[in-house]
């Protein structure tokens, strides 16, 4: 009998031992820390031109030792960083996630407002009241939080509020962005931790002020810059981040100087260290926004010493960031991904100077002419109630009062708009929303970029080389290319250097991250995981 029980015990122990080994061998391996690097204005051409000037541990480490998605394109129309970032983080398009641009025309109050504006929230350190309430889909950061409630930690450090909120989604512990009037870190009460204590400490102990008041001069001798080859009399520049953008403005140039990038790195590293990100087997995430924009720039291409210097200094910041992450967490335990927004290689100004057809489309005069045309057809009324982001809004109430055929009025506007310089097409919104068939077509890309909650009644597109500008002459989106490519790199963790030439779209990034982290994909995700550079379970 003893022998019988001994045999049973040994058998159970054996199977338990085997099961334990199998469980260990099939245990999911995940990166302990995910670091997202979003760079406003980043272009692959710039990285290539400056490659010989970069340090080995910054951009070069990511581009040479990482995975280069060489044919990654945006499958939405360029309308600002908010929609670009939301599309990357959700794996979806504005048709589903709702973020159609940095701003939109609010039909309820007949005004253009920020996509993140929310009067139900409070600002912390700022009068801005913002949230992610218009982001209608979960993000990969949200899914990480939901997969590991109260365990996965996620933070965002950004230069601008729109970028901060879209990177943070709905569930980040805290997001922080730069206030370039009062020169401090600020946030919104929408996120549960409010202003994180590291940002608050920098505001109080002078750390923010120290970095934000650094005078910006060339990093190297001015004649060594590429810009000097086009201008032998190129003079050294000097900027003070606290100087005003214009004579009557309270806003400073801080956000378009290297000081902004230094602030992001400094706070990001403080959060990683003090919050112990990446210290256990539960993945954490930190999203960082940088910029290569310069004060008062008119060109998207690399034409100024200031632009070069922004890249060269950011290269050193990224090198320092990676060195510190390697020390504190280990780059073999960290997954880094780096991407930019949609930006044309050349601005309309530059194209025009080289006799290439291009221009800026301003809606103010155009809408006045459209309204005059409709008055000639239907009577002296205000037929246009608003316009923004290639969306024309008609006065539905007045059209109904006059018992007019709404679709006929829509078509009249479409026909008239085709005569405007720079306009490629004009379509009734119902027609755009109903587009199907080839998902790669220009009309499908337009349909992806529209959401029923914020769409106008007529939607236009512009000719190649043309960009829309608002009433302050600020671009509304910065790319009008039929296919808009963006640099995108993965680096670290278990990845080997590789160039992926297979065409992918930015909606494929979130599902790829989800698969690597072994978490559910965002709930509106339409992309597919990129399979070339890693083995998924």
Residue ranges and their predicted role:
Residues 69-89, 156-164, 289-291, 335, ...:
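Short, solvent-exposed turn/loop segments enriched in Gly/Ser/Thr/Pro and often Arg
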Residues 1-29:
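Bacterial Sec-dependent N-terminal signal peptides
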Residues 24-67:
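Active-site-proximal N-terminal segment of extracellular/periplasmic enzymes that hydrolyze or transfer
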Residues 92-93, 101-282, 291-298, 421-425:
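His/Asp/Glu-rich, glycine-adjacent segments
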Residues 43-49, 72-74, 126-132, 251-258, ...:
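Second-shell loop/turn segments in exported
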Residues 364-405, 475-517, 531-536:
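Substrate-binding rim/cap in mid-to-C-terminal beta-strand-loop elements of soluble/periplasmic
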Residues 46, 254-280, 293-334, 513:
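A long, amphipathic alpha-helix that forms part
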Residues 54, 80, 102-129, 137, ...:
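Secreted, luminal/periplasmic, and some membrane-associated catalytic domains
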């Amino acid at each position: 009998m003893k022998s019988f029980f001994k045999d049973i015990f040994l058998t159970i122990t054996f199977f338990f031992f085997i099961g334990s080994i199998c469980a260990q061998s099939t245990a999911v391996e995940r990166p302990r820390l995910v670091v997202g690097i979003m760079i406003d204005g980043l272009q692959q051409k710039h990285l290539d031109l400056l490659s010989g000037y970069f340090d080995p541990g910054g951009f070069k480490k990511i581009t040479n030792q990482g995975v280069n998605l060489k044919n990654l394109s945006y499958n939405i129309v360029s309308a600002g960083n908010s929609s670009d970032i939301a599309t990357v983080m959700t794996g979806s398009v504005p048709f589903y996630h709702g973020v159609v641009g940095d701003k939109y025309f609010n039909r309820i109050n007949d005004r253009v407002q920020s996509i993140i504006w929310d009067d139900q929230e409070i600002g912390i350190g700022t009068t801005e009241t913002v949230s992610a309430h218009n982001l209608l889909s979960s993000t990969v950061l949200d899914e990480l939080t939901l997969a590991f409630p109260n365990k996965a930690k996620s933070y965002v450090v950004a230069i601008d509020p729109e970028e901060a909120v879209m990177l943070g989604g709905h569930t980040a512990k805290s997001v922080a962005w730069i206030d370039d009037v009062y020169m401090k870190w600020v946030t919104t009460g929408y996120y549960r931790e409010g202003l994180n204590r590291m940002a608050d400490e920098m505001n109080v102990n002078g750390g923010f002020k120290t970095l934000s008041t650094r005078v910006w001069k060339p990093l190297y001798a001015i004649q060594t810059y590429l810009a000097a080859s086009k201008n032998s009399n190129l003079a050294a520049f000097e900027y003070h981040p606290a100087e005003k953008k214009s004579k009557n403005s309270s806003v400073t140039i801080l956000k378009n100087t290297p000081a902004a990038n230094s602030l992001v790195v400094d706070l990001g590293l403080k959060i990683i260290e003090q919050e112990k990100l990446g210290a256990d087997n539960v993945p954490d995430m930190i999203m960082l926004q940088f910029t290569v924009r310069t004060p008062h720039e008119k060109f998207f291409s690399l034409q100024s010493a200031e632009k070069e210097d922004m890249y060269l200094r950011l290269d050193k910041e990224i090198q320092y960031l990676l060195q510190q992450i390697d020390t504190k967490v280990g780059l073999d335990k960290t997954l880094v991904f780096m991407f930019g927004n949609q930006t044309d290689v050349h601005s309309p100004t530059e194209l025009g100077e080289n006799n290439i057809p291009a221009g800026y489309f301003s809606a103010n005069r155009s809408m006045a002419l459209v309204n005059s045309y409709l008055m000639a057809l239907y009577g002296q009324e205000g037929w246009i109630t608003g316009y923004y982001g290639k969306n024309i809004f008609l006065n539905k109430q007045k059209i109904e009062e006059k018992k007019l055929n709404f679709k006929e009025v829509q078509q009249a506007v479409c026909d008239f708009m085709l005569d405007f310089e720079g306009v490629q097409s004009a379509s009734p919104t119902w027609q755009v929303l109903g587009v199907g068939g080839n998902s790669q077509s220009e009309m499908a890309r337009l349909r992806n970029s529209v959401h029923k909650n914020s769409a106008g009644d007529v939607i236009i597109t512009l000719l190649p080389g043309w960009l829309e500008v608002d009433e302050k002459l600020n671009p509304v989106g910065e790319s009008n290319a039929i296919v808009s490519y963006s640099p995108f790199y993965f680096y670290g963790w278990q990845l080997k250097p590789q160039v992926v030439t297979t065409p992918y779209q930015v909606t494929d990034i979130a599902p790829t991250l989800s698969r690597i982290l072994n978490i559910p994909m965002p709930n509106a995700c339409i992309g597919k995981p990129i399979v070339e550079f890693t083995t998924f379970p």
